[in-house]
Amino acid sequence: MNAPARIMCTPATGRPISVLIIDDSAVARASLSRMIEGVDTLRLEAAVDGAARAITALNEVHVDVILLDLEMPGWSGLAALPELLVAGRGAKILVVSSTARSGAEATLRALAAGAADTLAKPEAGHLNQAFQSVLVDRIERLGRAMLHDRAASPFVLRDEPVTAISLLAIGASTGGLSALAAFFAALPRSFTSPIVVTQHLPPSFMPYFADQLSAMAGRFAHVAQEGRIIEGGEITVAPGPDHLLVTREGADFVARLSDQSTATRCYPSVDPMLASVAEVAGPRAVAIILTGMGRDGTQGASRIVAAGGSVLVQDRASSAVWGMPGSVAQAGLACVAAAPAALAAHVARRGAV
């Protein structure tokens, strides 16, 4: 196995990003530890063989990012995830597991339970410099996002329109699955307007993601198909890498797919979806921007507001990463900032057309 390289980085946060490793494999712990210790902007606080030891460690030290294996004997990483979130006091959990190689189900279950991101762990002999570069990038993005969230500037909310909603568009990224679960659990079935969703995920995950949304929401969810009518009360999901756009044909909203380039380089992207929703629904369009890194959704949100529609964002306290919603709020585009369940209550009060 190649020795991990020492990566020289320029600290962007003023202090190293602190990391805790949880993996029952001694070989994996040693390899991951060397990778962390080989980066100037990261600091390894501890490497433990199970969730119970991790919770003990978290009582003594505070970390920014937790690397979590899912497949561990006894108390699995997936089962322990909720308690690790509590013990971590705001730490972001990056699932680093071989399970993430084999399919979407375990990965999406971890994301729905509150993991911020996932990374497929290669076999022991392939924990090399290429993997180290990807791992370090994921850790630093999560760590920087968390520290940026804490330093975010105040913002002013716009007046909230009171018109009924003809089309609801939701965008999310990091931490989005748990936020969507909370939102749809609180959205009554009496809300019957069409719903379109763009969640940053690999295209191969989208069918299972749609199935999960169906179970979460108690309403039919499906991956968008070119030319299919977007029915009331249903959830249509952007397929990736193509974006989901909405056109209008008579009284019907219709799904269109696009591979257009975007400023955010997200595929699928929230921005083109919102721009199309603004065009077809105007003042009866509502966009919700949930937790996620980056600025995807800000340009689209400006189009929604310009068309007379309204934009709601997840608040900082409940977001895994307040990048996307924070960008929209600080641009002065949001009329509501709240936890997902409260956002659902706002939508329900507005009602459907």
Which residue ranges define each predicted feature?
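Conserved acid/base catalytic micro-environments in cytosolic active-site loops
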Residues: M1-I21, S25-T41, A47, A51-I55, ...
